[in-house]
Design a protein with these regions (language model features):
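Bacterial signal peptide processing site
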Residues: 19-21, 159
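Bacterial N-terminal signal peptides that target proteins for export
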Residues: 1-8
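C-terminal motif of bacterial Sec signal peptides marking the signal peptidase cleavage site
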Residues: 15-17
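Extracytoplasmic c-type cytochrome modules immediately beyond a signal peptide or single-pass transmembrane anchor
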Residues: 23-153, 167-182
Length: 182
C-alpha cells in the first residue's frame, strides 16, 4: 500500500478555498420622501391619534358611531369595515408602523429640512412607536378606562416633537428650525 502524497491531501483543501466569494447583497436604496412633514403628519398620525383620542368620550361600538372610526376624518359614512375596536386597534398599530417614516429626510411645509437627524427627534420617534404599541395593548382590552389612561402616553409622545418643532412662534416661519441651546 502506498502512502498518500502530501500534495494529494492538500490539493482538495486548496481547491475548496479557491471558490468565488459569495456575492454581497446590494444595500437597499434609501427611502424617498413623497410628502413634506406637514402632509405626512396630516395623513397618518393626525387621523389615527384622533381615533384613539375619540375613545376618551365615545365607545367605539356605541350606537352613535355609525361611521368608520379609522377613516371618520374622511367621512366614510355608514361603513363598518374599519369601525369598532378593530379600527381603534388598527389606528394604534398605524402610529407605530408609520413612525419610522418620520426619520426619512424630507422638508417641512416651509421648505426647511425636517430635523430628522437630531437626537431628540429620533427619541420622539421611538416614543411614538412605544405609544402606538401601548395604545394597541390598551385597545385589545376593549376597556375605555384603559384607553383614557393610554391617551396621555400618546399625547406626551406627540408633544415631545410638537413643543420644540411645531408649536413655536410662526411669525418668522421657524417651524422645524433647530434652535441653539441657550
Amino acid at each position: 500500500m502506498k502512502t498518500p502524497k502530501p500534495l494529494a491531501l492538500i490539493l482538495p483543501l486548496f481547491l475548496l478555498g479557491c471558490r468565488a466569494p459569495e456575492p454581497v447583497a446590494a444595500a437597499a436604496p434609501a427611502p424617498k420622501a413623497h410628502m413634506n412633514m406637514l402632509q405626512l403628519m396630516r395623513a397618518f398620525p393626525f387621523p389615527h391619534s384622533n381615533v384613539l383620542f375619540d375613545t376618551q368620550t365615545r365607545d367605539p361600538i356605541g350606537p352613535e358611531k355609525k361611521q368608520s372610526m379609522t377613516y371618520s376624518v374622511y367621512r366614510w359614512q355608514d361603513s363598518d369595515t374599519y369601525a369598532g375596536w378593530e379600527g381603534v386597534e388598527n389606528s394604534a398599530l398605524a402610529l407605530s408602523e408609520m413612525a419610522p417614516l418620520l426619520l426619512v429626510p424630507r422638508t417641512c411645509a416651509n421648505g426647511l429640512p425636517a430635523p430628522v437627524d437630531q437626537a431628540d427627534w429620533k427619541a420622539a420617534v421611538e416614543g411614538l412607536v412605544g405609544a402606538g404599541e401601548a395604545a394597541h395593548k390598551a385597545a385589545l382590552t376593549k376597556n375605555l378606562d384603559e384607553m383614557l389612561n393610554v391617551s396621555e402616553t400618546v399625547v406626551n409622545s406627540c408633544s415631545a416633537c410638537h413643543d420644540k418643532y411645531r408649536d413655536v412662534d410662526l411669525s418668522g416661519g421657524t417651524r422645524c428650525e433647530v434652535k441653539a441651546k441657550k
